[in-house]
Amino acid sequence: MSNIVIVGAQWGDEGKGKIADTLAEKSDLVVRYQGGNNAGHTLVVNGKKTFLHLIPSGVLHKHTKCVIGHGVVVDPIALDTEITRLQDTGIEISANNLFVSESCTVITSYHKLLDAVRENSTTEKIGTTGKGIGPAYEDKVSRKGIKFKHLFDKDVLRSRLALSLAEKETLFKDLYKVEYPSLEEEFERLYTLGQKLKQYSADTFSIIDQAVSTGKNVVYEGAQGVLLDIDYGTYPFVTSSNTSVAGVYSGATTAGHNLDHVIGITKAYTTRVGEGPFPTELFDDTGLFIQKKGGEIGVTTGRIRRCGWLDLPLLKYSAKCSNLTSIALTKVDVLSDLDTLKICIGYKYEGKEIFCAYPGIDLYKVEPILVDMEPFSLDEVVTKENMPSALKTYLRTIENHIGIPISSLAYGPSREQILFFEDYFKKG
């Protein structure tokens, strides 16, 4: 058995879904442990794209069970829509293969409205997706949240909804001056959805614990990336959950169980959606080339992603934050045939050269130390034997700086276009 964690090692959008989908073929359980439908995973199978936001990437494998852990915030409307959309394409989703923690915090219309009006009312944009993620986590922490299991009990749901609305009502009326659904409207909407989704509600704590205890293969699928972590990320331009490996322990069930692999998913370059510092960002034709060739448009937001060179000081920082055991490098093909190729090995900051970022660093004030790398061209199928020497040098540069190995290499959109250097399911 293996317990494998997939963590985004950058600002999200690294290709976690593709790696999770590939590993799901040998997995008994794939578990989402944090975030919500602000995540966006694109899977390409036989040339067909499948977009996922809440449901784990194991859904394309009939033998694999999918779990949404208690650390996830769930929008019932989004969940119902995603289930229906996938079922309409012939993907099997039932109470036999999808399990939603009864303890998940629910996203309401009030959370989404509050998210939107806050973002639109400030001059300092965070770049929120507007999905209500942050406000839902706020209610969770302040003990005003609605749990998934509350959707099925009329009295409890109405009581919890009234508690959640009490403060927001004042904000909507007096501060933001916006219309909002009445308590009864929202109650009816949520209760109706709850009856439809009740079949998926489960004690996921026990499901995961049982799987691990009996030697099953479990993959924990993260959303976003370490650099968006509420504690480790580029605050305040972060999400509202622990996107690092810490989120596995708080948002799923691994207490008393060892993690065999913590894989940091990393693009061969760097991207970021929304606001925030980006030391290696490219503003020239090369950046535009990478954006177009890489199809760098957010699945969830539709926003164009900012692009830049691979940032090793930030990658090393992510590796330390999540105790990564290896790197899965994705989208290497996007860098193929570039005339110029660079990589950031360090920063000049406050009169010093540093080679690993840290929480207190002001990334707006760093000057990236860029080194030229030899460009390379890739064949349609990449093997260890035909891999260009320039690419091998690029990989060694990453490994030497980060201090951990690259365990897989993705060089195209389909699940077949991955070269594995390590068997994650082999012990020892």
UniProtKB/Swiss-Prot annotation:
Annotated pathway: Purine metabolism; AMP biosynthesis via de novo pathway; AMP from IMP: step 1/2
Residues annotated for substrate binding in this entry: V299, T300, T301, G302, R303, I304, R305
EC identifiers of the protein: 6.3.4.4
Binding-site list for GTP: 12-18, 40-42, 305, 331-333, 410-412
Binding-site positions, Mg(2+): D13, G40
Location in the cell: Cytoplasm
Domain of life: Bacteria
Keywords: Cytoplasm, GTP-binding, Ligase, Magnesium, Metal-binding, Nucleotide-binding, Purine biosynthesis
Entry similarity comment: Belongs to the adenylosuccinate synthetase family.
Protein name: Adenylosuccinate synthetase
Organism: Francisella philomiragia subsp. philomiragia (strain ATCC 25017 / CCUG 19701 / FSC 153 / O#319-036)
Name of the gene encoding the protein in the UniProt record: purA
